């Protein structure tokens, strides 16, 4: 899969891969391509087994005692808690039925002295038979302090006869297990990538979206990245011949790119959207505030402009073309009409019918 993505063949070398595979296999919102991470997806799917074992114990396969990996079991345990009823199914020591966690986690020193056969007792069994009788007598001082704390907590526990215990899945609004919520929880805590929403919710073709994704991650083969790898590279930006070529300079900060963006933002009637000389693509793109009904239209045009500037750069570097803002604007206009004909840009709306008004011809 990695070889097909980067080179269209089975085998590739590390230098062909512009982004590490574990980063590619993350959700688009946090900077990946949304390709499933099979290891995490497998763990998320297998978390369904302990869920069904507790919520539907009459399934035929339950008697086979299927082994669940620690990773899947960890997902299940992190996502579930018990709503206590009659205490017939909630496990006293290992289930999350107290308001703030599991006894085994809240009181690990005490739990270490609980006899193993008793660790699977239900809340009702533990309360009727005396949960303190399941603890070895030679407790440490810390375990004894936790024992006293548990005695105090148990004073407020009341069972509700006739009401079954209920296991709740915290990561889904329905309270029921879903593989998607289990999988997405594996990425919880990661920061949303700048520009991710704008890139992937635009209507641009997939090729252009992937380019914008690489550009936002600074993974295009510009001179700065080639230089770090001691590879042949242009000595300066092929547009202005004044600064080192970086992807942000090339697409936004260069005087050439700013000339193009000036025409675009003026055509929109939004000159304040003009990128600064030191802007980064993801941050600048995220900071744009179009009206809700125009967001996808604006995001699509931004992708088109960046894609066209990049192609013109490649014409200069590889084909010996001369820098020309007029050529870039004309190509934006021509390709924009093709995108409009394909339904990627609206025919009617607040944007001009042509993607950009050329300064020199119209």
Question: Which residues does each PLM region occupy?
Answer:
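A helix-boundary/hinge signal
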Residues: 1-362
């Amino acid at each position: 899969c990695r070889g097909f993505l980067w080179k269209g063949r089975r085998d590739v070398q590390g230098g062909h891969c512009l982004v590490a595979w574990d980063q590619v296999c993350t959700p688009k919102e946090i900077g990946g391509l949304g390709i499933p991470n099979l290891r995490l997806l497998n763990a998320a799917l297998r978390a369904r087994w302990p869920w069904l074992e507790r919520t539907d114990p009459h399934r035929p396969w339950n008697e086979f005692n299927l082994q669940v990996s620690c990773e899947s079991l960890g997902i299940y345990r992190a996502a579930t808690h018990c709503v206590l009823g009659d205490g017939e199914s909630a496990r006293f020591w290992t289930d999350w039925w107290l308001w703030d966690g599991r006894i085994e986690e809240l009181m690990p020193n005490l739990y270490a002295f609980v006899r193993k056969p008793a660790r699977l007792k239900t809340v009702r069994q533990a309360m009727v038979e005396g949960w303190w009788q399941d603890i070895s007598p030679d407790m440490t001082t810390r375990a004894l302090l936790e024992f006293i704390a548990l005695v105090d907590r148990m004073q407020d526990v009341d069972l509700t006869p006739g009401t079954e215990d209920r296991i709740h899945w915290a990561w889904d609004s329905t309270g029921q297990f879903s593989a998607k919520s289990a999988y997405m929880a594996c990425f919880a805590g990661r920061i949303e990538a700048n520009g991710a929403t704008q890139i992937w919710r635009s209507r641009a073709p997939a090729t252009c979206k992937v380019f914008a994704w690489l550009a936002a991650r600074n993974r295009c083969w510009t001179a700065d990245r080639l230089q770090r790898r001691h590879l042949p590279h242009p000595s300066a930006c092929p547009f202005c011949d004044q600064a080192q070529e970086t992807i942000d300079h090339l697409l936004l900060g260069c005087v050439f790119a700013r000339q193009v963006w000036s025409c675009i933002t003026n055509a929109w009637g939004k000159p304040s959207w003009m990128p600064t000389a030191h802007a980064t693509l993801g941050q600048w793109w995220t900071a744009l505030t179009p009206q809700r009904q125009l967001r996808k239209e604006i995001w699509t045009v931004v992708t088109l402009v960046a894609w066209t500037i990049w192609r013109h750069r490649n014409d200069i570097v590889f084909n010996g073309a001369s820098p020309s803002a007029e050529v870039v604007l004309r190509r934006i206009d021509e390709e924009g009409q093709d995108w409009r004909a394909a339904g990627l840009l609206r025919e009617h709306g607040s944007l001009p019918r042509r993607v950009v008004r050329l300064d020199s011809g119209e």
